[in-house]
Structures are given as structure tokens and as C-alpha cells.
């Protein structure tokens, strides 16, 4: 089996024109087209919206219990006390992005229990 790192290096050094030519030749050799793979994804666009993987947790407002919200923001992120306080006081702000659905819902529930108004996007 060829050295995969060498193949990766070789592919990384290709220009855009060379990469397009490589793609074209591979399509011919393997008897496939790049468009065929993209068509099912486009048709399932509505379903992809519902099955969203990454969520952004937005703090809309801190509510009356700002200290509790700051504590939960610190627990959900790696922010220090001052950064978490600034985030909470500057609402609406993004608390965390790229979070899976389960974790996003857990963080949202904790922030809401602390008194915050939160949205998932």
C-alpha cells in the first residue's frame, strides 16, 4: 500500500486547475460523476434542516438572577469570571457554538433554571 502521507502531500500541493483535472479523470476512470452525489443531498435539504447537528446557544437576557446565570455560563464554557460576567451583561450574546443537540438542550435547561432567557440556533 502506498504511503498515505505522501499521497496527502501530493494532493495538497495541487493547484485548483490540477485538482479539477484530477477530479475529471477519476470520474472517467471510476465511471461516476460528482453531480450524482450532490443531488440526493439537495433533495433532502428540508430534512437536513430538521436534523441539524451543530447548535449555537444564544443568551437573550440574564433575567433577575445574573449571578446564577454567570455561574452556569462559566460551567458551560471555559470562560473566566470577568469574561462570563461581560458576556451575561452584554446579552444578547453567543454563549457556545458547534454544540450537539443533546448538550445544547442540557445547557439551555441549566441556563433557564438559573433565570436566563436562551435560544438555540
Curated annotation (Swiss-Prot):
CDD domains the record matches: Ribosomal_L7_L12
InterPro entries on file: Ribosomal_bL12, Ribosomal_bL12_C, Ribosomal_bL12_C/ClpS-like, Ribosomal_bL12_oligo, Ribosomal_bL12_oligo_N_sf
SUPFAM superfamilies referenced in this protein's UniProt entry, alphabetically: ClpS-like, Ribosomal protein L7/12, oligomerisation (N-terminal) domain
GO BP terms in the entry: translation
Any one Pfam family match given in the protein's UniProt record, by short name: Ribosomal_L12_N
Keyword field: Ribonucleoprotein, Ribosomal protein
Superkingdom of this protein's organism: Bacteria
A single cellular component GO annotation: cytosolic large ribosomal subunit
Keyword ATP-binding set for record: no
Gene Ontology terms, MF aspect: mRNA binding; structural constituent of ribosome
Task of the protein: Forms part of the ribosomal stalk which helps the ribosome interact with GTP-bound translation factors. Is thus essential for accurate translation.
Entry-linked NCBIfam families: L12
Family as reported in the entry's similarity comment: Belongs to the bacterial ribosomal protein bL12 family.
Quaternary context: Homodimer. Part of the ribosomal stalk of the 50S ribosomal subunit. Forms a multimeric L10(L12)X complex, where L10 forms an elongated spine to which 2 to 4 L12 dimers bind in a sequential fashion. Binds GTP-bound translation factors.
UniProt protein name: Large ribosomal subunit protein bL12
Highest classification ranks of the organism: Bacteria, Pseudomonadati, Pseudomonadota, Alphaproteobacteria, Candidatus Pelagibacterales
Gene that specifies this protein: rplL
Amino acid at each position: 500500500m502506498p504511503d498515505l502521507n505522501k499521497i496527502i502531500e501530493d494532493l495538497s500541493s495541487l493547484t485548483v486547475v490540477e485538482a479539477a483535472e484530477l477530479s475529471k479523470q477519476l470520474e472517467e476512470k471510476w465511471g461516476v460523476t460528482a453531480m450524482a452525489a450532490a443531488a440526493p443531498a439537495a433533495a433532502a435539504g428540508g430534512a437536513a434542516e430538521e436534523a441539524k447537528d451543530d447548535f449555537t446557544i444564544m443568551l437573550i437576557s440574564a433575567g433577575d438572577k445574573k449571578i446564577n446565570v454567570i455561574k452556569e455560563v462559566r460551567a458551560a464554557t471555559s470562560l473566566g469570571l470577568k469574561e462570563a460576567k461581560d458576556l451575561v451583561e452584554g446579552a444578547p450574546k453567543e454563549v457556545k457554538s458547534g454544540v450537539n443537540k443533546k448538550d445544547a438542550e442540557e445547557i439551555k435547561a441549566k441556563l433557564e433554571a438559573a433565570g436566563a432567557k436562551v435560544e438555540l440556533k
